[in-house]
Amino acid sequence: MSNNPGKLIIFEGTDGAGKSTQIKMLANYLRSKGLDVIASFEPTNGPYGQKIRQLYTDRNKVTRNEELELFLADRREHVNKLINPAISAGKIVLCDRYYLSTAAYQGALGFDVEEILQRNSFAPTPDLALLLQIPVEDGRRRITSSRGEETNDFEKAEMLEKVSTIFNSLSFPYIRHINACQSIDNVQRDIIMQVKQLLKMA
């Protein structure tokens, strides 16, 4: 076990906010400072995560309760196999989506947000949650522009408006709001400022 305490930094927000791009940039920055960084994402590439991805094109395959159970099972495996061991080893874990996304997206489908959060109590609390904020329609335009395809069921405007409302209602002390409407470099600047404060970097 490392003498240096590991950290869990998560990136949250509606689709099209630029989370994946910002995680790559932050990982490169932290590694350039000599820090041991692991970048991960949810849903994972594990068996449960792959089943979740299949739902992006056909959500009629499972009930909403079964869908939620898949997210929980995928996260439990992620926590046990990667997140907890990495934190114990003193590494910095950057994660693209975590349980706040489950609360927001499944909450938008009608589940009780507090109940979802309670059911995720097995997962370690993030040291920092960077909530990238962008108007829903701007995010949808980014999705179709980058992928060259239509949005899926999780990315419809009405759904994302509900998701955004839930994200904004969350008031945990580890959440920091980031304006994702800025240039990529300016978004990264704001993210680095928050991360430096967390890691007590000069």
From Swiss-Prot:
Q: Give the CC-aspect GO terms.
A: cytoplasm
Matching entries from CDD domains are given as: TMPK
Q: Which Pfam families match?
A: Thymidylate_kin
Q: Please name the GO terms that the record assigns under molecular function.
A: ATP binding; dTMP kinase activity
The alphabetized list of GO BP terms reads: dTDP biosynthetic process; dTTP biosynthetic process; dUDP biosynthetic process
SS bond list: none
Binding-site positions, ATP: 13-20
The reaction(s) catalysed by this protein are: dTMP + ATP = dTDP + ADP
Q: Which keywords, in A-to-Z order, does the entry hold?
A: ATP-binding, Kinase, Nucleotide biosynthesis, Nucleotide-binding, Transferase
Assigned EC number: 2.7.4.9
Q: Where is the signal peptide?
A: none
Q: Which domain of life is it from?
A: Bacteria
> What family does this belong to?
Belongs to the thymidylate kinase family.
Protein role: Phosphorylation of dTMP to form dTDP in both de novo and salvage pathways of dTTP synthesis.
Give the protein name, as stated in the record: Thymidylate kinase
Species of provenance:
Desulfotalea psychrophila (strain LSv54 / DSM 12343)
